[in-house]
């Protein structure tokens, strides 16, 4: 018998599960490529802000053409510091320039996957990537996972390390703190296990505190029964 599961409620997109993006500071993207393709823009950091939707602080930068943009703040950035975006930007923390212009061995973050997309890779607090080698038609970068990934030389990146590192070193300790962490992004918390529920609420529920049936389930199972190891090839420890 099918149950009304949490993931079925989540799929309806009610406010219980919707991200409170109206509280977030805004999008963090690079200046459009057509503006800084041939010239370098100079900007000044006006303020450093907490963003509840991110693991890193953001900095508001005012550029010389009068526009203001949010950037991911690098470690060591200061209010009043000048930063540059463009192909002729100096090699310094917080500056953004194409990967073709960044020397090997440099820490970078917020790397574009496609030239002009505004930055897609390495954006979490405390993360950084390493420029490993440069060739005529590609730049090889080591991502935080250790993967070596190829990027086009025109893809832009920011020099430095994303601020906000070490946030996971301090233990949460109290459930109340975990509550506020989840509330900031409207995460569904606490999330009870299926075996702790009543039998009417979950296929694994009931007072016996064991599933009572195989935890593997077909890929074609109806939504109310599709919980556990979905279409698993194998379960348990490998012998």
UniProtKB/Swiss-Prot annotation:
Classification via Gene3D superfamilies: 2.30.30.30, Nucleic acid-binding proteins (2.40.50.140), Ribosomal protein L2, domain 3 (4.10.950.10)
Annotated stretches, region: Disordered: 200-239
The keyword rRNA-binding belongs to this UniProt entry's keyword annotation: yes
Keyword line: Ribonucleoprotein, Ribosomal protein, RNA-binding, rRNA-binding
Any Pfam family the entry gives: Ribosomal_L2
GO BP: cytoplasmic translation
Signal peptide span: none
GO cellular component labels: cytosolic large ribosomal subunit
Ranges of compositional bias, category Basic residues: 222-239
Keyword Cytoplasm: no
Recorded superkingdom: Archaea
InterPro entries assigned to the protein according to its UniProt record, in alphabetical order: NA-bd_OB-fold, Rib_uL2_dom2, Ribosomal_uL2, Ribosomal_uL2_arc_euk, Ribosomal_uL2_C, Ribosomal_uL2_dom3, Ribosomal_uL2_RNA-bd_dom, Translation_prot_SH3-like_sf
GO terms assigned for molecular function: rRNA binding; structural constituent of ribosome
Family matches, as SMART domains: Ribosomal_L2, Ribosomal_L2_C
Family from the record: Belongs to the universal ribosomal protein uL2 family.
Stated role: One of the primary rRNA binding proteins. Required for association of the 30S and 50S subunits to form the 70S ribosome, for tRNA binding and peptide bond formation. It has been suggested to have peptidyltransferase activity; this is somewhat controversial. Makes several contacts with the 16S rRNA in the 70S ribosome.
Quaternary assembly: Part of the 50S ribosomal subunit. Forms a bridge to the 30S subunit in the 70S ribosome.
Name by which UniProt lists this protein: Large ribosomal subunit protein uL2
Source organism per UniProt: Thermococcus gammatolerans (strain DSM 15229 / JCM 11827 / EJ3)
Lineage of the species this protein comes from: Archaea, Methanobacteriati, Methanobacteriota, Thermococci, Thermococcales
